[in-house]
Every structure is written in C-alpha cells, then in structure tokens.
C-alpha cells in the first residue's frame, strides 16, 4: 500500500532534506521518501523519539500497519493506513480538522514528536537502513481510530497570545492580540 498510495514523483533523499524527486519505483531505494501524495493524507505517521516502539499496546491503541525502526537508535515511525483525506484548499475543513484531532490525540498517547508531520518525508518502509515490521493490511477509518482516544476540542489558532514569548514592545503585543481576533473572523467566514 505504501507504493500504491505514494505520489508518482515523490520527494526522496539519503537524509531528511528530501532534495530529490524521483519516480516512486526509484524513490523506494532511498531511506527517506514522501509517502503521502500532495494534497492527500493516506498514512498517519507518528515519530517516536524513544525506544518503545510497542507503546501502542501500553496506551490501549490499535496496532499500526507498519513499524519502521532505526537500527542504531531504536527510534521508530508508526504507520496507520487511513482512507485518503483531501487537504487541498478545495477540501472541506471539517474532515481535515477531524483528522488533525485524531492525530494529536494519538501523538499525545504515544508520546510522539508533535512537530513531525510538518515535513513531507518519512522513513521508507522496507529500506535496508530500517527494520520494518508489517503487522496487518487493515485500513482504519478515522472514526474507528477516534474510538480509542478522547478528542480535544481546541480552537484552530491555539491557546491565545503568549505574551511571555514575544518581546515587550507595543507593536508585538498589538500584533498578538489582533492576529487571534483575525483568525476567528477568517474561521467564521469559511
């Protein structure tokens, strides 16, 4: 499924920079590649920066489809297959928000790196650099995954202004106040 859901020309490289674009038949030869197509998410990938790859059992979560483990450090990526969710500008915002809520709830339970999904690449399953374990081929519905966690309801713009993290000039404080107000207006108009 990784090969069929990957883009035809995924980004790939020998490191996390994803500097090359190759056909997927060649991209799987690189240790890092783009597994989700642009504009679609078919895999929820969790980056575990600890050595407990089986933490999903202790957390009471369903088994991932794939576990891709680093041979040296023991860190791993957990891959959960889901039906493709469109993330383009033409997509509906509710399914995207639902997918993000499920992802964040799983990431919290798995003690996963929450900054991981910002990049396009992940470890390539089956590459010789990694130990890859395929547990099953089941494709999880988002509702099925959501049954295992409590979804937090949060605003899309965060927790509000963090005045301790900005400089104390009046311009920065004014910007922090206004940007959250603007986010609420934009969200209401969508």
Language-model features, listed with the residues they occupy:
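A signal for specific C-terminal beta-sheet/loop modules enriched in small/flexible residues
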Residues: 68-72, 93-104, 174-189
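Flexible helix-coil linker/hinge segments at domain or subdomain boundaries
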Residues: 100-145, 150
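Modules that initiate DNA replication and primer synthesis
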Residues: 83-88, 145-190
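Signature for HUH/AEP ssDNA processing cores
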Residues: 1-76, 82-97, 116
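A residue-identity detector for tryptophan
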Residues: 43, 56, 129-130, 157
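Generic low-complexity, intrinsically disordered sequence content enriched
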Residues: 7, 13, 25, 135, ...
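Generic surface-pattern signal
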Residues: 61, 107-115, 183, 187
């Amino acid at each position: 499924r990784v090969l069929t859901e990957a883009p035809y020309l995924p980004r790939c490289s020998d490191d996390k920079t994803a500097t090359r674009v190759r056909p997927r038949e060649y991209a799987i030869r690189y240790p890092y590649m783009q597994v989700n197509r642009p504009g679609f998410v078919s895999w929820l990938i969790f980056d575990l920066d600890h050595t407990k790859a089986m933490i999903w059992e202790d957390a009471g979560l369903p088994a991932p489809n794939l576990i891709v483990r680093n041979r040296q450090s023991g860190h791993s990526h957990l891959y959960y297959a889901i039906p493709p969710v469109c993330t383009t500008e033409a997509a509906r915002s509710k399914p995207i928000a639902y997918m993000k809520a499920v992802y964040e709830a799983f990431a919290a339970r798995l003690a996963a790196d929450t900054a991981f999904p910002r990049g396009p690449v992940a470890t390539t399953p089956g590459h010789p650099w990694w130990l890859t374990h395929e547990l099953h081929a089941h494709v999880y519905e988002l509702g099925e995954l959501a049954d295992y966690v409590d979804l937090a309801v949060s605003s899309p713009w965060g927790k509000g202004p963090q005045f301790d993290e900005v400089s104390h000039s009046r311009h920065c404080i004014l910007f922090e106040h206004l940007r959250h107000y603007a986010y609420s207006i934009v969200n209401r108009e969508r």
